[in-house]
């Protein structure tokens, strides 16, 4: 009798062949043999996820039980679903899996052994199992032998919910059950749902252990100094943390404990629309055999990749293990950060390319989480629009925003970290008339912030937003540092700045229990 690896404990009975922790090459072979994708000219496995090319936030639910009810910030992000609804759907899902070959990944989330969690992911598709093999932390043979998962994800894209029977909004569903330590995903092939489900789990569990979970990338300088880059999808977390002059800790999800910071993952999930070897050489070179390309156009005959094409989606992605980046820190841990960067892609074109924040301003802008929702990262978003995503990660935060803000604020204060706001969005006008901020200039400004060069320049307070804008920065033309100077008609800039300021005030009004010092640290003009 073949080994079932304990799947019967999940209610999965009579499966076909179960493949557990296959090596990368075997998963690629099987995916190709099953017609799940094709091999691109650089050796990466290229797949198409169908109509779901981004996360489906409106199809994500948390099972409402007495044990978690008072800990969850219920609402449009954390939608409740009953235990009965979950069990009904779960029963049909496990029946669907009977007779099917399944791919199991047993590994970990959390690079710090003190906080890492053993996880299991069960996949219907070989390519998705390759994805999680590359994205999470892979076990040693010894660790695998004694592996007991504390949380399990079952992902079956071919199984579709029936909304009128299952109580879902659509055929797609992502349901987190904290009591059962189980996540079920169906109806969508977008691999990011698995990654972000585990992130949400960590965001729920870690605050109880005194750890601040963060939607950020992190890197380390030659002297061991670390930096964090917060931001929503498409704002530059992966791009800016992959710096040949520094060592990459991780590109998306981290924890900040009393010992320092640690990566949750063992891989990267990079946006690759318009990727170029010139501007992002580390990411370009990391996409090779063993990597997964999601919804990237590949010529079916010559297999040449067209990174410029958004024919399938703007949200094209590449997944690869962190050690495909030559200067990655293994394991992904570092000391307490000296610099914290908040990234925003401002579609209004009024935010400066870089500004320094006081601690109170840092809390204001962290809670605000302003950016522009960029095309493709969520279904239905086809052009950028202003959005406020609390703590730069509202879709993944099950608890009250103040839980995360207090944890971060306490650590910034205790370790005296410098905080900067960096705009990777538009300058010279709003989206449509302005232009996207130059990546080389952004890199130069971030470099100046990290190496202390900005400590030596003069700053001037922004009359509307209050933060401090540098008058000079090495490697950057002085005229672009003040965004008002980049607009042809300054009165239009002033009107747009006032418009954005009013949106900030309107959004922040929902934070009733925030100290007055933080409320007053925001918009001033």
Swiss-Prot record:
Q: GO MF terms on file?
A: ATP binding; metal ion binding; phosphoenolpyruvate carboxykinase (ATP) activity
The broad enzyme category this protein falls into is lyase
The residues that the entry says bind Mn(2+) are 196, 215, 252
Key words, A-Z? ATP-binding, Cytoplasm, Decarboxylase, Gluconeogenesis, Lyase, Manganese, Metal-binding, Nucleotide-binding
Q: Where in the cell is it found?
A: Cytoplasm
Q: Where does ATP bind?
A: 196, 215, 231-239, 280, 317, 442
Name its pathway. Carbohydrate biosynthesis; gluconeogenesis
Under catalytic activity, the entry for this protein gives: oxaloacetate + ATP = phosphoenolpyruvate + ADP + CO2
Q: PANTHER family recorded for this chain? A: PHOSPHOENOLPYRUVATE CARBOXYKINASE (ATP), PHOSPHOENOLPYRUVATE CARBOXYKINASE ATP
Q: Which family does it belong to?
A: Belongs to the phosphoenolpyruvate carboxykinase (ATP) family.
The record's HAMAP family line, in alphabetical order, gives: PEPCK_ATP
Name the chain's protein: Phosphoenolpyruvate carboxykinase (ATP) 1
Q: Which organism is it from?
A: Moorella thermoacetica (strain ATCC 39073 / JCM 9320)
The gene from which this protein is expressed is pckA1
